[in-house]
Structures are given as structure tokens and as C-alpha cells.
Amino acid sequence: MSTSKRKRGDDANWSKRVTKKKPSSAGLKRAGSKADRPSLQIQTLQHAGTTMITVPSGGVCDLINTYARGSDEGNRHTSETLTYKIAVDYHFVADAAACPYSNTGTGVMWLVYDTTPGGQAPTPQTIFAYPDTLKAWPATWKVSRELCHRFVVKRRWLFNMETDGRIGSDIPPSNASWKPCKRNIYFHKFTSGLGVRTQWKNVTDGGVGAIQRGALYMVIAPGNGLTFTAHGQTRLYFKSVGNQ
């Protein structure tokens, strides 16, 4: 009875064989999840000319996550949105009522989250419940204790403005000079990590009445009665998530 032996050449060829590696299921899942992520969208709100923001004593409150339903980049595509980042760029200009006085004031800008807006934007006094005696001092305002479950301050920024009793068109005499004051200031802020989730009703507009849960307001108040107008833009970075 004869036995067959494997030749050395066969052993060498066997060792040279390269086995193909199969891609792991974890790698496939990671690649797929990146492809399925919704892209970051941008909405820009411009305020200039006839759409400038007038900031009276006591402040102003405006809804900023105004994502109407649609197919454009600034529209919401689903019934839920997530606002991640906000860029604020404005020029604050003391108005005609404030310029005739020599004054300085510390104003405040807030980003306020409203869990249940109820179809109507609140006033600054509704949010902060300040007494009339503190109307001119917004740096002292705090969210109302009774409504702290509804309103959450996401960001708070201070700024200083000045007036010297003159208006911008005044011309100094030839033998004198006037040092500048902060009658007109540039205000810039960029903030991330907001994580504002908004649930929308089955309507197409982007007003506060269309929000079921999660409105985001920009609140601005002047300090010491130094009223002004705001000219510029707010840019919001968000995603459309959830169901169509």
C-alpha cells in the first residue's frame, strides 16, 4: 500500500495564500450612520432699514427659531428641529430720544428657551417679572420663580453704551475736538452647544403659534434708559430631525 506525500512546493504555495478580510459589521454600521445623518442647515434673520429692531426701555422679545415648513435650506423639512449654534452680529445705535443726554448704561441680551409657548410670544416682564422700579436696570433681572419651569436662560451677555449730549450730525467748533463715546457699538457673539429641540404643529408657517414645544427667543434690554436701535443679523445653525 503506497502513501502519497505532500511536496515542498505545495507547502510553499499554501503558505503564500492570502486570505481576504471581511469588513466588520461595526464598520459598516458606522459608515451607514454617517450617511444617514441630516445635514446642518442655516437660517439668517436680517434686521436693517424698515426691519431694524427698536429696543425700548423694558426691553424687547423676539422669536428667532422661525423655521417655516419647506424645501429650502432655511426651512424645516420635518416635524422636529434641533438648533445647535447661533451667530449674532449687530450695530447698536443710540436713538434720538437718548442722544440729548449725557448717560451710560449696561444693556443685556439673552437667549431664552420656552418649553411651552402657548401660541404667543411673552414680554420681557413676563419672563423676568421685574418690578417697574427696576425697569431701567436689566442686569438685575432674574427669571420669575413661578415660571422657572417654563423659561430657561441659555445665554446672557452684557454690553455698555454711552451718550454725551450730542447727536451724530453735530459738528465741533474749529478750535475744539470731541472725544468719541460709545453711542454706536458693534455687538458680536457666537455660541454653540445650545441643543434646542423644537416640536412643530402640523402647519406650514414658522411663527410662535406653530410651535408645540421649544421656542427660542432673543431678548434685548437697554440699561439706564439708554434706548437704541439694532441693525444686523442673526444666523441660526439647525437640523431637521424626526418624522416627516
From Swiss-Prot:
Q: This protein's superkingdom? A: Viruses
> Pfam families per the record?
Gemini_coat (PF00844)
Q: Single Gene Ontology BP term?
A: symbiont entry into host cell
Q: What is this protein called?
A: Capsid protein
A cellular component term, taken from the record's GO annotations: host cell nucleus
Organism of origin is Maize streak virus genotype A (isolate Kenya)
- InterPro entries cross-referenced by the UniProt entry: Gemcoat_MSV, GV_A/BR1_coat, Viral_coat
Sorted keywords for this record are: Capsid protein, DNA-binding, Host nucleus, T=1 icosahedral capsid protein, Viral penetration into host nucleus, Virion, Virus entry into host cell
Family annotation (Gene3D superfamilies): 2.60.120.20
